[in-house]
Amino acid sequence: MYNFIMYAMQLGVRIAARFDSKVRKMWRGEQAAFGVLQQRVDPSARYVWFHAASLGEFEQGRPLMEAIRREFPDYKILLTFFSPSGYEVRKDYKGADIVTYLPIDTVGNARRFLRTVRPVMAFFVKYEFWYNYLHILNHRGVPTYSVSSIFRPGQIFFRPYGRQYGRVLRCFSRFFVQNEESSLLLSSIGIDQVEVVGDTRFDRVLQVREVRKQLPLVERFVGDSHRVFVAGSSWLPDEELFLRYFASHPEWKLIIAPHVIKEEHLAQISQLLQGKKVARYTQSSEETVADADVLIIDCFGLLSSVYHYGRVAYVGGGFGVGIHNVLEAAVWGMPVLFGPNNKHFQEAQGLIAAQGGFEVSDDAGFAQLMDRFTKDEAFLQESAGRAAAFVEKLTGATERVLQAVKPELEKNCQAQS
């Protein structure tokens, strides 16, 4: 049944590629993947393979990737993506020797891929459970790890009808999971090669904080204002919520980095901002931005550094399929607000428990919270400190994973020499 689904998926992608530019990029990338590998794989090298579905998973795997590269430079790194949103942004990533798409998980593709690369170790980040790739890796005795994975009772592996597919989990040498609940769930189906290490994203946001970009244009916009609200990865429902409040609160400067940067959406934001002076990052100079009330970040790659300039952050997605990365904001020591769809996001729940994060579901709740931040500086600073402390406390997952896999990496080095 699984293989039938994979072949149907392959056919579906081929058909959808005719009508959807994003799917077309994925299809072409997968078709080109074997050519890339044939040209670039060094037959004498030993490859450690990292697979990430998209950009978020890449950021989770990145600290470990870079730690292995730093401590074991003799290994080469292969990085694969499933989604164009990951590959297109990171196809030139210098921390990997080869970056490409992962061909769809058919038996033929998996055999050909692994025969070409011959990895000595493999890491799948978070939710990646491709049966054919994993089965062949296991059959070949390749140490294979699931990193920053998290499991919930409703997943197919833990339902009676999903036990057969759950066998894919036995192909992993070890799971490095985010929490104790995940460990207990795996144990309930007889999988005990599990270590609770936490989430490598905490390590990643600390790394980003240390090498933040200097943004003179944003600094000029902020000036000497002590009330700067930064909205990151926002969608229209998020923007409608907070812009209704700020329409009558001119004491706050706004920086908006929308998740979708298309002219149609930017026009919607501008429509909501009638009466305010609006500047777009790519169209402004330090002179023109100084008098603006709102700065729209209309390009990618700046958000993690932009948060540095805020006093209060809002992370979008909570009125849709789910919130985006709250840790990118929290690491800068500021209270983080987000919408109600956050229950399956452990980091958001932890931030709420630490009193550094706040769920808002309507205009009244948002206004009440922002009014308090405006009038009570002590409350704002206390919330900010708790957000930063929450992130600092939960770092270290990367080092724990590295120490666990280091003996295997050292053994491979000795075998080669």
Regions found by a protein language model. Give the residues of each.
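Nucleotide-activated sugar donor-binding and catalytic core shared by glycosyltransferases
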Residues: M1-S417
